[in-house]
Structure formats: C-alpha cells, structure tokens
Amino acid sequence: MATAKVLLLDIGNRQLKTKLGDDRNAFDWHDAVALNSFEAYLRVSNFDILVYACSAPQAEAQVLDVINTYPSKKILAEHIALEIVSTNTGIDRLLTVFAASKIASTPVIVIDFGTAFTVDVVDAQNHFRGGAIGLGLGSQLSALAQAAPHLAPPSESNEIIPASTEAAVFDGTYRALAFAVRGLVEHYQVAGVENAAVFVCGGDAHRMHSLLPDYRFEDQLLFDGMQRVAADNWL
C-alpha cells in the first residue's frame, strides 16, 4: 500500500479534524448536523484507509458509528516509535512530540495550545518523559467571561503595566499563559534537556505567536505525527 491514499482523522475535545492530502476540514462532533456533514464528507472522499487518533474517549463510540463501514486503523501508543516512560498519556501529546522529534533530530519540548495546554518533553534518548497540562487559552477566556461577564474582552496594549481593563484581561490570560509555558520550558530544560528545540502547535497557537516569537510554530504537528505513524505501521 505504498501509494495508498490515507485519510487522517483527529477526534478531539471540540472537533473532528480531517486531513486528506492537502485538504483539511473540521466538524463539531457535539452537533448532529455537523456529524451528518462529516458522514457526507466521507462518502464523497477518495481514500484507501482511514487512520484515526482519539483524545476524546467520550466521543469515540459516536464517531465509530460513522466510520465503521470504512477500512480504518486506530493509532495507539504502541504504534509510536518512542520509549514512553510516563503513564496514561494522551495520544495527541505523543503524536505531536513524535513529529517534532523527527523534524528536529534533537531533544524537543512541545507546547500545544488546545482546549487544554500541554508542555511535553522528549529527551536525547528518545524517551517521552511527560510534561504539564493546564487550562487552555480559549477555555480560560470562556471561564472568565462566564464568571465575570462585566469585564471587557482582552486587547493587547503597548504599556508595560496595563491601565485599561481590556489590557489587564489580556495580560491576565494571554501574557500570563505565555509566561507560564516559558517558565515550564526553562524548568524542563534544567531537568536534563538543556538543548531541546521548542515547538508550538494547537488550535490557539496562532493567538500566542507574538508572545513567543523565539519558538518554532508548526501548526500541523499532530497530522505530521499521524502520517509518520501510519507510514511506519500500515503503509
């Protein structure tokens, strides 16, 4: 199956994301209409095998009902060429660090800004060491808006110390998160991966670019990892 057409499917916390060649799509699995659109998309797509990864087990059965008529493979930790020394690690975290480690050929630290943010480490011996998980940017903004609806939405300011509510909310969310992940990166580099290349990915990564300009932004790390795993195991 060296020339097989592979449809990659990421079952995430908020969306189903697909990649077929250069074509990418997203569907909300919480929405019956969107799921119907996903099913219609599969019917008209030309692929030989569907390879999927699931980081939202609460959605998997629902999605399997849609894809079970197609030849498919589920990516598990055992399919990924990493020595995993952590426990109960989400497949999305493993896939992004695997892709980054292949790109950089050095120890890597990967920051993923999604529903949750993660900061994960692969050392020079190809060991996935683990990392951090926290509340993602979008989730923070939603929680703050719900808890304090009178606050204005965030807006970046050139002032070092914010003088407006909008700038204060920006610093308390965007900038605070940037400082948090930088602190974690520095902490993990001291712990034995001092020369690690730092990658950034995830749905909210573009919103953090100006605050982390010295890191390498790669918005397709997850799909890159999935493609590499598919090639290693089934193609």
Over which residues does each language-model region extend?
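Conserved phosphate-binding catalytic cores of ATP/NTP-utilizing and phosphoryl-transfer enzymes
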Residues: A2, A81-V108, F223-L235
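Conserved phosphate-binding loops in N-terminal lobes of ATP-dependent enzymes
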Residues: A2-I67
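Active-site rim beta-loop-alpha module in soluble metabolic enzymes
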Residues: G134-A191
